[in-house]
A protein has these predicted regions:
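Metal-dependent enolase-superfamily TIM-barrel catalytic cores that perform enediolate-based chemistry
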Residues: 190-298
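Signal peptide processing junction and immediate N-terminal pro/mature segment
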Residues: 29-45
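N-terminal secretory signal peptides that target proteins for export/translocation
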Residues: 1-12
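Conserved, mostly hydrophobic/aromatic
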Residues: 105, 165, 178, 254, ...
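Structured beta-strand/loop patches that form or line metal/cofactor-binding pockets in enzymes
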Residues: 53-104, 109-117, 386-392
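Bacterial N-terminal signal peptides
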Residues: 16-28
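Metal- or metallocofactor-binding catalytic centers and their adjacent structured scaffolds
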Residues: 59, 64, 69, 101-176
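Shared catalytic-loop signature of beta/alpha-barrel
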Residues: 275, 286-404, 408
Length: 435
C-alpha cells in the first residue's frame, strides 16, 4: 500500500552499482533510442533526454516485491452505450480493470475499455485472466522487460491486454516512488486544456443543446461525432458556425474514416478555421498520400484515427509523407505506456505533435493524461461525454477543475477505485488468482 517501503538488500545494492557503471559506459558509446530500449530506465532516458538511472530500484524484482495476487474486473453501464457515427450501431463499453498486489503491499492498477456491438461481454476479462498465472510467475517488474517476454511467450495476446499489464506495472513503479506517474515520466505541468468529446446525436438541435450544456461545466472546445454523410455533416457545420460565431468556442469533427477524398475536401472547405480547428479521421488511415493532399489544401488541422494502425513504421511513413498536422493514438489500445513512449519519442524527434486520445473511463483517461502531461507538444485532453457516466466506480474520477483537466492527486495513476461499488454496474464480472 502507500505506506509500504521498498527494501534493497546489499546484494541488490551491488547489482545497482554495477548497472550504473554499465549504463555510464553505454551512454558514452552509443545514444539510446526508444525502440532499442531494453528496460524501463533506458526508455525513460530516451523519452526525456535525461538520465533515469535513479529510477532503477522502482523496477527491481525481489521475493518481497513479487506479485502475489491478480484481480480482474469487467464493468459496464448502459449510460456509456452510444453511437460514434451515423454509420454504426451503438457500442457497449466494458471497463476492464486489472489490479495486481505485491508481497510487500503495493498495488498496480490499470483500466482499459473495450467495445462490443451487440452486448456487454467478458471477452477481454477472460483473455486477461489467461495471463494471471504468467503475472504471478514474473521474475521482473520492469514493464519493458515484461512486455518483451510476453511477446515471445504469448504472441497471441491483444494489444489491449498488453496495455492492461504494462500500465499496471508503470502504476506500480510510480506508487513505489510515491509520486504521480507523469512526474516519473519527466512531466512538469499538472494540468491542461480539455475538450468535451460528444457522442453521435440524431438531430441537429441535439448538437447545439449539448454544446450549451457542457459549456456550463467549463469546456470551451467540443468535438462532434457525426453522420458520415456529406450533406448532413455540412448542415451541422453551417449550423454550428451560425450559432456560435461569436462564442469564443472551438470545434472539431471526427469522421471515423467514413469519407472518400472528395467529400473530405468538400467538408473541410466549408469549415471556418476560426471556429473549427481539427478534422479527425476524414478518410481511411492507410491513405497517407491523400491525407497529405488534404493537409496541403485545407486550413483545418488534419489528424488520423490512430486506432488500427500505430506501429513505429507507420508513424515514420506519416512523417515522411507529411500526412498529418498531428499523429494520434491511445495508450490503452496500442500496448500501454511503454509503446506510447516509443512512439512519442519518434514523433518528438520529427517535431510532430501527437494528439493523444483519452476517450474511456477514468482509469483509461488517467493513463493517457499522465502521458500528455509529460509530453509538452500535446495540447488538448479529450474528455468523453456524458462526463459522469465514465467516472463510474471511481472515488475521484472527476478530473475537471475550473475549465482545466488536472492530474489526480496521489501516486501512480492517482485514481482511487471504489471496489465494492463496481458490483452495482449493469454488467459486472470478477476473476482472481493468488499465489
Amino acid at each position: 500500500m502507500a505506506n509500504a517501503e521498498t527494501r534493497i538488500d546489499s546484494a541488490s545494492a551491488r547489482m545497482f552499482a554495477a548497472l550504473v557503471c554499465l549504463l555510464v559506459a553505454s551512454v558514452g558509446s552509443a545514444p539510446l533510442t526508444a525502440q532499442s530500449s531494453a528496460n524501463a530506465v533506458e526508455l525513460l532516458a530516451a523519452f526525456s533526454g535525461e538520465p533515469a538511472i535513479q529510477y532503477q530500484p522502482l523496477f527491481q524484482f525481489s521475493q518481497e516485491s513479487r506479485i502475489v495476487a491478480v484481480e480482474i474486473y469487467a464493468v459496464g453501464t448502459e449510460s456509456t452505450t452510444a453511437q460514434y457515427s451515423g454509420r454504426e450501431h451503438a457500442w457497449h463499453v466494458v471497463n476492464n480493470i486489472l489490479r495486481i498486489t505485491t508481497a510487500d503491499g503495493f498495488e498496480g492498477i490499470s483500466g482499459v475499455d473495450t467495445y462490443y456491438e451487440v452486448e456487454f461481454t467478458e471477452q477481454a476479462l477472460l483473455e486477461l485472466h489467461s495471463v494471471a498465472a504468467d503475472l504471478l510467475a514474473l521474475q521482473s517488474l520492469d514493464p519493458v522487460v515484461v512486455g518483451a517476454m510476453l511477446k515471445r511467450s504469448r504472441p497471441e495476446l491483444s494489444d489491449e491486454v498488453r496495455a492492461s499489464i504494462d500500465i499496471a506495472l508503470w502504476d506500480l513503479a510510480a506508487r513505489r516512488a510515491d509520486r504521480p506517474l507523469y512526474q516519473l515520466l519527466g512531466g512538469r505541468r499538472d494540468s491542461m486544456e480539455p475538450y468535451a468529446s460528444l457522442p453521435f446525436y440524431h438531430t441537429l438541435p441535439e448538437y447545439v443543446d449539448a454544446v450549451n450544456e457542457y459549456a456550463t461545466l467549463g469546456y470551451r472546445a467540443f468535438k462532434f461525432h457525426v453522420w458520415g454523410s456529406i450533406e448532413e455533416d455540412v448542415r451541422l457545420v453551417e449550423l454550428i458556425q451560425q450559432t456560435f460565431a461569436d462564442s469564443g468556442y472551438r470545434f472539431m469533427i471526427d469522421l471515423e474514416g467514413a469519407y472518400g477524398f472528395e467529400d473530405a475536401l468538400r467538408l473541410g472547405g466549408v469549415m471556418d478555421e476560426r471556429l473549427f480547428i481539427m478534422l479527425e479521421a476524414p478518410i481511411d488511415d492507410q491513405l497517407l498520400e491523400q491525407y497529405a493532399q488534404l493537409r496541403s489544401r485545407l486550413a483545418v488541422a488534419i489528424v488520423p484515427a490512430g486506432y488500427n494502425i500505430y506501429t513505429p513504421e507507420f508513424i515514420r511513413q506519416g512523417i515522411d509523407t507529411a500526412a498529418w498536422d498531428a499523429g494520434r493514438f491511445d495508450a490503452t489500445a496500442i500496448g500501454g505506456i511503454s509503446t506510447a513512449l516509443q512512439l512519442l519519442t519518434i514523433a518528438n524527434d520529427a517535431d510532430l505533435t501527437i494528439d493523444i486520445q483519452s476517450w474511456g473511463h477514468s482509469l483509461a483517461q488517467a493513463a493517457n493524461l499522465h502521458l500528455m502531461l509529460a509530453n509538452e507538444r500535446t495540447r488538448y485532453f479529450e474528455a468523453p461525454m456524458p462526463k459522469q457516466a465514465y467516472e463510474f466506480g471511481m472515488k475521484n474520477g472527476d478530473l475537471l477543475d475550473v475549465g482545466r483537466v488536472i492530474a489526480p492527486r496521489g501516486s501512480g495513476l492517482g485514481i482511487d477505485v471504489n471496489w465494492e461499488y463496481l458490483a452495482t454496474a449493469d454488467f459486472y464480472r470478477k476473476l482472481g488468482s493468488e499465489e
